[in-house]
Amino acid sequence: MSSSHRTPGPERRAAPGVTHVLVGFSKGVLADLDDLLPAGAVLVLDEPDVIKARGALEKAKAHPCVAGIMAAATQDEPHAERLTELLDRPPRVQAVIPAVEYGVVGAAVLAHAWGLPGAGPAAARTLRDKIAMRAAADASGLAQPQWAIAETVHDVEEFRERHGGRCVLKPANRQASLGVRVLGPDDSAAEAWQHCTHADEPMLRARYALPGRYLVEQRLNGPEVSVEALVHSGQVGFTNITAKAVQPGTSPVEMGHVVPAGLAPGVEASLAASVRELVRITGFQYGVLHSEWILVEACRPHLIECAARLPGDSIDLLIDLAYGGRFTGDYLAVLEGRGPIPPRQKRGAAAIRFLTAPTGTVREITGRELASALPGVQEVTLSVASGTTIAPVTSSWSRPGHVIATAPDGRQAAQQAAAAASLITFEMDEEMAWP
């Protein structure tokens, strides 16, 4: 770690009551931990840039579980071992939790150094780098799209030509579909390259963070699913399969999820075997794996990507609603070394539907109360308000809100969520065409 990445400060010690260290600031994870841990139990580590950009010091005051926030070079992945020079092992520490994608490596390194359960540094580094993950999957024979490293737009054009005029371009170390572009024969590779290589998350990433790397992949056809698996000592325990709906067009952003997916038993067995193989080839030890797959011919899993952290898009809440219990609590149990989490039976189904809106400036949003009153609706959330300018949805961060609903089965839950979402209307001061 260069001196410019160090965060000087007199404190190497956490507050006496700290039992859990969170690598990365996440309001969602902290809200869960407020319910699961006593006040003052959590120390949050994050980049100085991110702490400032997100107003984390002020926002943390709303979370009783937070003992403090410490600035640290959590995203300096090549030198993550130096995090141990910043912070002494808290005497009562029970777990280190990666709260965000960019904290996965730092959390794994701290857990390993402190003798606590974690992903393992090597596994974390593989799973944070889509190129490394693709290479590991190729070496094991795990089914996945054909792929290549892309260093120029010419690489994209050549790959597309070799694969029937279709491909997917993506960053190797981002999240939330940020920068991902789906290309057909007539789509501009130059425009896609410009979009992909300039996509960033300045609110979430340090200014010095690793430079972008890119890969281009074969486009596969078939339903998309994700698998959320709790792993203990390299063994897969509780597992859920989530069905996904992805918006059409060049930006494949997820617009809905259903838990559980309700697949045929044979397909579920194939996915389970693929996840076990993914655990084996990465050497993943303790935590949660959120892996995404395309079912070619609706039955053959092909790996798309995998994250070694809690899933986003409220999938953890959908799991809670469909199975009972607390998925985040089970995750803590694994990271605290309290043993494996066994499979359990579903008791219903849950679905999330993300809202869509015209592009332009919002004048008024109506229908929220009507949507909330529908049977089975559990949550209606808006992420925009009057005066907000809405752009096209190009990543998970640009969706204007969502609805969550429950029902006895997945089809009904999805229908209820869609019906509620249809009642919410965005009135615009002016609708605008977007370049």
Question: What residues fall within each predicted segment?
Answer:
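Conserved ATP-binding module of the ATP-grasp superfamily
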Residues: 143-145, 166-169, 186-221, 252, ...
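A structural supersecondary motif
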Residues: 289, 371-390
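ATP-dependent carboxylate/phosphate-activation module, predominantly the ATP-grasp catalytic core
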Residues: 218-284, 288, 295, 303, ...
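A conserved helix-loop-beta module that forms one wall/lid of the active-site cleft
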Residues: 113-179, 201-204
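ATP-grasp fold ATP-binding core
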Residues: 137, 160-182, 201-222, 227, ...
